[in-house]
Curated annotation (Swiss-Prot):
Annotated catalytic residues: 163 (proton acceptor)
Additional remarks: Can restore mycorrhizal and rhizobial symbiosis and induces spontaneous nodulation in a Ljccamk mutant of Lotus japonicus. Can restore nodulation and mycorrhizal symbiosis to a Medicago truncatula dmi3 mutant.
Binding positions (ATP): 19-27, 43
InterPro entries: CDPK_Ser/Thr_kinases, EF-hand-dom_pair, EF_Hand_1_Ca_BS, EF_hand_dom, Kinase-like_dom_sf, Prot_kinase_dom, Protein_kinase_ATP_BS, Ser/Thr_kinase_AS
Annotated binding of Ca(2+) 2, by residue: 441, 443, 445, 447, 452
Protein name: Calcium and calcium/calmodulin-dependent serine/threonine-protein kinase
Organism per entry: Oryza sativa subsp. japonica (Rice)
Name of the gene encoding the protein in the UniProt record: CCAMK
UniProt function note: Calcium- and calmodulin-dependent protein kinase required for arbuscular mycorrhizal (AM) symbiosis. Involved in response to water deprivation stress. Required for abscisic acid-induced antioxidant defense and oxidative stress tolerance during dehydration stress. Functions upstream of MPK1 in an abscisic acid signaling pathway that regulates the activities of antioxidant enzymes and the production of hydrogen peroxide.
Residues modified to Phosphothreonine: 263
Record's comment on post-translational modification: Autophosphorylation.
Length: 516
C-alpha cells in the first residue's frame, strides 16, 4: 500500500454506481485504474465533526499513530471514529482473512474518509439461503464454520463485533461455493477504546443478555449472536418469542427458549446441544469461536446431510421479509425529524410556498450546482436560490442552512432541505409517508432497498426521536404492531399498508406531520 500522501481517491479509482446508503455514509462500486481493473467497494464516511486525524490519504494506518479520542462526540462521530479504528486494527492484526472483509486502502479529503474495501457481490446470508428450495444441517454447519473462523481471527485481535447478524454476513460472489465475509464494524469495539454508542440501534433478536442489561460486552457476546443465527438457520424463526417486546427481553435475560416445535424433531441432538451452549445466559459457559471450529457438528462430522423440512425455508422466508419490513418501520420514525425541521422552516419562511414545479426545479438545480451531488455548502445553496430567481430567500439562506446543518460540518444534506420545503406544501399524513419513502429511495426505483434503510436510525438526532423509541428493542415492538405478510420488497404501497394497519400506530408516528 502506497504511502504517498498527495494521492486522491480519483487518482487510483473510478467511482461507478451506488451500492447502498446510510445515515452518514455511502457505499459505491469502484474500479481500480491499474491494469487489473479490480472492482472494490468504496465506503465514504462523511466528515461530521473535527477533521479526522491519524489516517492520511492513501496510506495504511500506522501502528501506534492513534486516533483522536474526543471527549464529547455525537453518535455519528463516535461511529465514524470507531469504524476507522476497528478497520485499522483489522489491517494490522487480522487481514488477509477469507471470512473478514478486507480493507485495501484509505483516503481522506474534504468530503470525508474513504475506505476502499473488498467488494462482496454475493448477497446477504439469509437472502442466499431463502433462494434455495431446501437445505441441510451440513449446509448450516458450513455457514457457522465460516462465521466462527472470522470471529476467531477478530477475537484474537481483541475485536468484538457487537452487531453480528445476517445483514452483516455477505458472500464474496454469487458462486455456490462462495466464502462468507463478516463486515460492518461501526458498532464494534477494541481494547483501550470506549464503548461505542449502541442504545439507538435495531432489533434485540441477536443481542446477548449482558448487552441488554448494560453489563460488560465481550467476545462471548458475539457467540450468543452465533447461537441465535444457528437457531434461525435450523428452524426458520428466532429463539425468543413473546407477545410484547418487554416479555421478549425478559426471555432473553433468562435464556428461555425451546426445541418444542415439530421441525426440531429431525434436527440432530448435537446441533441442539451446541445451540443450548451458545445461548447460555452466563457468558463464560459459551464456547469460543475456536471451540466451535473443533466442534464435531460444525466440522461436519455429525451434521445431517438430509434436506430439512421445506417448512423451515418457508418460515425463514417470512422471517427475512419481516426483517426487511422492520426497516420500513424505522423509516417511519424519520417523520419525526422531518416534522421538527418543517415546523422551524415554516416559521422561518412565513407564507412562502413552493409550487410543485419549483420543487422539481429545486431538485434539478441542487444536482447541477452541488459538486458533491448530495451535500451542499452555504455558497452552493445560495447559488441554487439565485438560479431559481428566489432572491427574496437569499437573505434567509444562512439561517435555513444552519437549520439543516445538524452536524455543524459546513454542509447540509440536500434531500433534507427538499423534504422540508416539500412538507410546507404537502403536510398531510399520506404525503408525509410518501416524502419519508421518497427521501431515502435514493435511486428512485419505487422500492426502498434494505441498504437504503439499514442505517436510517443513525441519521436521527436523539432529541428528534419520539418517546421511548430509544429503549432497547422498542423498534421491534413498533414493528410487531405492523406485522404483515410480505414478499420482501418494500414498495410504497407496502410501506403505507403497514402504517395504515394500526390507526393508533399511525397517530403515534405521523400525527405531528398533519396540518396544525
Amino acid at each position: 500500500m502506497s504511502k504517498t500522501e498527495s494521492r486522491k481517491l480519483s487518482d487510483d479509482y473510478e467511482v461507478v454506481d451506488v451500492l447502498g446508503r446510510g445515515g452518514f455514509s455511502i457505499v459505491r462500486r469502484g474500479v481500480s485504474k491499474s491494469e487489473e481493473k479490480t472492482q472494490v467497494a468504496i465506503k465514504t464516511l462523511r466528515r461530521l465533526g473535527p477533521a479526522m486525524a491519524g489516517m492520511k490519504q492513501g496510506t495504511k494506518p500506522v501502528p501506534g499513530s492513534g486516533l483522536p479520542m474526543w471527549k464529547q462526540v455525537s453518535i455519528s462521530d463516535a461511529l465514524l471514529t470507531n469504524e476507522i479504528l476497528v478497520m485499522r486494527r483489522i489491517v494490522e492484526s487480522v487481514a488477509p482473512h477469507p471470512n473478514v472483509i478486507n480493507l485495501h486502502d484509505v483516503y481522506e479529503d474534504v468530503h470525508g474518509v474513504h475506505l476502499v474495501l473488498e467488494l462482496c457481490s454475493g448477497g446477504e446470508l439469509f437472502d442466499r439461503i431463502v433462494g434455495r428450495d431446501r437445505y441441510s444441517e451440513f449446509d448450516a454447519a458450513c455457514v457457522i464454520r465460516q462465521i466462527a473462523s472470522g470471529l476467531e481471527a477478530l477475537h484474537k485481535a481483541s475485536i468484538v463485533h457487537r452487531d453480528l447478524k445476517p445483514e452483516n454476513c455477505l458472500f464474496s460472489d454469487k458462486d455456490e461455493k462462495s466464502t462468507l465475509k463478516i463486515m460492518d464494524f461501526g458498532l464494534s469495539s477494541v481494547e483501550d477504546f470506549s464503548d461505542p454508542i449502541v442504545a439507538l440501534f435495531g432489533s434485540i433478536d441477536y443481542v446477548s443478555p449482558e448487552a441488554l442489561s448494560r453489563q460488560e460486552v465481550s467476545a462471548a457476546s458475539d457467540m450468543w449472536s452465533v447461537g441465535v443465527i444457528l437457531y434461525i438457520l435450523l428452524s426458520g424463526c428466532p429463539p425468543f418469542h413473546a407477545a410484547t417486546n418487554r416479555e421478549k427481553q425478559q426471555r432473553i435475560l433468562q435464556g428461555e427458549f425451546s426445541f418444542q416445535d415439530h421441525t426440531w424433531k429431525t434436527i440432530s441432538s448435537s446441533a441442539k446441544d451446541l445451540i443450548s451452549r451458545l445461548l447460555s445466559v452466563q457468558p463464560y459457559k459459551r464456547p469460543t469461536a475456536s471451540d466451535l471450529l473443533r466442534h464435531p457438528w460444525v466440522i461436519g462430522d455429525c451434521a445431517k446431510q438430509d434436506l430439512m423440512d421445506a417448512e423451515v425455508v418457508s418460515k425463514l422466508q417470512k422471517f427475512n421479509a419481516r426483517r426487511k419490513l422492520r426497516a420500513a418501520a424505522i423509516a417511519s420514525v424519520l417523520s419525526c425529524k422531518v416534522a421538527l425541521r418543517t415546523k422551524r422552516l415554516r416559521n422561518l419562511l412565513g407564507t412562502h410556498d413552493l409550487t410543485s414545479e419549483e420543487l422539481d426545479n429545486l431538485r434539478l438545480h441542487f444536482g447541477r450546482i452541488c459538486a458533491d451531488g448530495e451535500n451542499a455548502t452555504l455558497s452552493e445553496f445560495e447559488q441554487v436560490l439565485r438560479a431559481m430567481k428566489m432572491d427574496s430567500l437569499i437573505p434567509l439562506a444562512p439561517r435555513v442552512f444552519d437549520l439543516f446543518d445538524n452536524n455543524r460540518d459546513g454542509t447540509v444534506d440536500m434531500r433534507e432541505i427538499l423534504c422540508g420545503f416539500s412538507s410546507l406544501r404537502n403536510s398531510r399524513g399520506d404525503d408525509a409517508l410518501r416524502l419519508c419513502f421518497q427521501m431515502y429511495d435514493a435511486d428512485r426505483s419505487g422500492c426502498i432497498s434494505k441498504e437504503e434503510l439499514a442505517s436510517m436510525l443513525r441519521a436521527l438526532p436523539e432529541e428528534c426521536l419520539p418517546g421511548d423509541i430509544t429503549e432497547p428493542g422498542k423498534l421491534d415492538e413498533v414493528f410487531d404492531q405492523m406485522d404483515a405478510d410480505s414478499d420482501g420488497k418494500v414498495t410504497f404501497d407496502e410501506f403505507k399498508a403497514a402504517m395504515n394497519k394500526d390507526s393508533a400506530l399511525q397517530d403515534v408516528l405521523l400525527s405531528s406531520l398533519r396540518p396544525q
